[in-house]
Amino acid sequence: MKLLYCMLGLSMAACTPQKTVNGGEDELSMLIGTYTDGTSKGIYSFRFNQKTGTATPLDSVELSNPSYLKPSEDGKFIYAVSEMNDSTAAVNALAFDKQTGNLRLLNSERTPGAAPCYVSTNGKEVLTANYSGGNMSVFRLRKDGTLSPAEALFKGTANGPDTIRQIVPHIHCALFSPDGKYIFATDFSADRILRFTLSSEGNISRLPGEAIGIAPDSGPRHLTFSPNGKFAYLINELSGKVIAFGYTDGKLEQIQSIAADSLRARGSADIHLSPDGKFLYASNRLEGDGIAIFTVDTVNGILTRAGYQPTGIHPRHFNITPNGKYLLAACRDSNVIQVYERDTENGLLKDTQQDILIDKPVCVQFIPPFHN
């Protein structure tokens, strides 16, 4: 069964009911970010049932290239980039109604660097990683959820061996540590991870030498932390390897490097752990598009290859439902979000054939069940 989401130009009223019903703990809010150089409008909201794997379209909002978005912890606000490679590059704050799925733009602020491709928030600040700008920008949040203008800007460097893709600085990811004391940013073109200290007042600083070097020609892309906060895992776009780190009070110590992309297509993309921390998934693009699956030793953080799931074309981003039952892959060039059921015993994936068809999907985010 495939859900066609307004790809034929139908209005939202024709695609969705005007009222929604509270389906209990199994009903999630789901938000989809897209590239808008085709027929896609911007951000789309759905109701997703994490028991059955079915999706119901609710609303959309027009926004240019919202290629990455992040909900606030309470789900009332959404922060989304506009990944534009010019002066219109921005980060946007939106109000979100979890009951109806309605999205409403509150305000936008320009990012000091072009092509913002990642956004994160701790409820007080918002970070953007600006790929073409080669920098990370910081925005303070007002009490009403809106963004203040950018206050700080931290630049990456470029000294990697790839004379095409590492010739200028690129920052691909910026996120807060689980303990909230630090910020980590992937310095793609310098093959390193930058570490910043975050004070209780929200001041951010980086001392000389506060960077974690990795192997040359790696192209660090996305970083994620284990549920228990003891380990971190990095997907490297160019080398196609996952690096496992032990994490203690701001320190990342490498414990393993293992291939996620055996074809060396230089297009690895996203990385996530299952909610129980027992399995890790990493997506690959350009050749052999799919998701590498690993088991995780939750005691020492070591990964073991468990399988590989072919997907649609260009799985730029994916996410796992809070109950761990489903993995949804946003396959940009197949214009589809594929819904996979997870085997919680071995981590393997099974295509449910409950595709969500939407033009150029590149980000999937969930908000926990809503309550009256």
Where are these regions (language model features)?
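Beta-rich, blade/repeat-based domains predominating
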Residues: 39, 63-74, 112-123, 157-179, ...
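Bacterial Sec-dependent N-terminal signal peptides
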Residues: 1-27
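A short beta-strand motif characteristic of beta-propeller blades
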Residues: 56-61, 104-110, 151, 158-165, ...
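Short loop/turn segments immediately following the C-termini of beta-strands
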Residues: 35-37, 83-85, 131-133, 141, ...
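Short loop/turn segments immediately following beta-strands, especially the blade-tip
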Residues: 47-53, 94-101, 139-148, 197-204, ...
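Asp-box/WD-like beta-propeller blade repeats and closely related beta-sheet repeat scaffolds
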Residues: 102-173
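Blade-loop segments of beta-propeller domains
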Residues: 57-123
